């Protein structure tokens, strides 16, 4: 993963690796959910939905990054839907497909899944700062 592409560091970096990225088209990444993650507690046994959406936004940023000086910033989340859960031991797969690219804004459809089980979907907008 190109760590220069995201300003996030532990504990707010929610992707462990980028598996595919084509600027202007799509990106794919993953997060390995562990019992050691700070958000897993005795009462919180799954990755919170808001953090799944953040992981999707971090994945989406890679569709607009063209060089090490580019920075992707979350600008919008619409139609966010929780469809399942990601618990310790799961690999959360994250994908983002670009639907529009306009004046520095990248919009698209994001999906999170564990295996074949969907976890979340959302329409996400990212602003790319150069």
Swiss-Prot record:
Q: Name one Pfam family in it.
A: FabA
**Which organism is this entry from?**
Bacillus subtilis (strain 168)
Where does the chain cross the membrane? none
Q: Gene3D superfamilies this protein is in?
A: Hotdog Thioesterase
Query: According to its UniProt record, which protein family does this protein belong to?
Result: Belongs to the thioester dehydratase family. FabZ subfamily.
| Protein's name according to its UniProt entry | Uncharacterized protein YcsD
PANTHER family registered for this protein in UniProt: (3R)-HYDROXYMYRISTOYL-[ACYL CARRIER PROTEIN] DEHYDRATASE, 3-HYDROXYACYL-[ACYL-CARRIER-PROTEIN] DEHYDRATASE
Q: Which gene encodes it?
A: ycsD
């Amino acid at each position: 993963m190109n760590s220069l592409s995201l300003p996030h560091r532990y504990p707010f970096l929610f992707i462990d690796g980028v598996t595919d990225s084509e600027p202007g088209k799509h990106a794919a990444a993953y997060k390995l959910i562990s019992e050691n993650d700070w958000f897993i507690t005795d009462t919180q046994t799954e990755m919170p939905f808001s953090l799944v959406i953040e992981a999707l936004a971090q994945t989406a940023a890679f569709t607009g990054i063209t060089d090490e000086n580019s920075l992707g910033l979350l600008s919008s989340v619409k139609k966010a839907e929780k469809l399942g859960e990601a618990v310790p031991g799961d690999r959360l797969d994250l994908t983002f497909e670009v639907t529009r690219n306009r004046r520095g804004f990248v919009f698209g459809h994001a999906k999170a899944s564990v295996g074949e089980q969907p976890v979340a979907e959302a329409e996400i907008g990212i602003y790319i700062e150069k």
